[in-house]
Design a protein with these regions (language model features):
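Enzyme catalytic cores with a strong preference for nitrogen-chemistry domains
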Residues: 1-167
Length: 167
């Protein structure tokens, strides 16, 4: 619940900004913990995008903690005292930009959520990540992002932890 409180503080403290903001945040939906991206603007939470694909190989064991979007029991989530949409295929409009969101591993699967988002009209995809560093991974990831951007005919913004980040 501390994450939700911090999220609400951030939403309230940026209410004067006409800026679509997207942050990563663990949230509870019913009895399920989700790894999510939250989109908000002008003090209003617009929607929550849960991570679709949870890796369970090597050092990644996310299924131990989180619930994948396909296993969620609800399509709305209560944050503070307000219910907002909870779905991996939400599109947020900001001027002429139609924004879709996916989280880390979602990009690495054969048919990423961004493919469906692009078919629904998204022209800018954001990917929130906390990916680790491995030899050769950066070049592969860069290629993957460029290919997905081209397939989707959309801009692709990938934001991850910085080099050397260990937390």
């Amino acid at each position: 619940r501390n994450a939700e409180k911090a999220l609400l503080d951030l939403v309230n403290n940026t209410a004067d900004l006409d800026l679509l903001t997207i942050v990563g945040c663990p949230l509870v939906s019913g009895s399920q913990l989700i790894n999510a991206a939250v989109a908000f603007q002008r003090g209003e939470i617009l929607g929550v995008v849960p991570k679709s694909y949870l890796p369970s190989y090597k050092e990644f064991q996310e299924e131990r903690w989180f619930t994948a979007s396909s296993h969620l029991q609800q399509s709305m989530i209560t944050i503070g005292n307000r219910e907002v949409p909870l779905d991996c295929y939400l599109i947020f409009e900001y001027d002429e930009v139609r924004v879709g969101i996916e989280i880390c591993e979602d990009l690495w699967v054969p048919i990423p959520p961004s493919s469906e988002l692009a078919m629904q009209g998204a022209n800018l995809i954001f990917n929130l990540s906390a990916s680790n560093e491995l030899i050769g991974k950066h070049a592969y990831l860069r290629s993957l992002i460029c290919q997905q951007s081209a397939r989707c005919i959309a801009g692709y913004v990938y934001a991850s932890s910085g080099f050397g980040e260990s937390s």
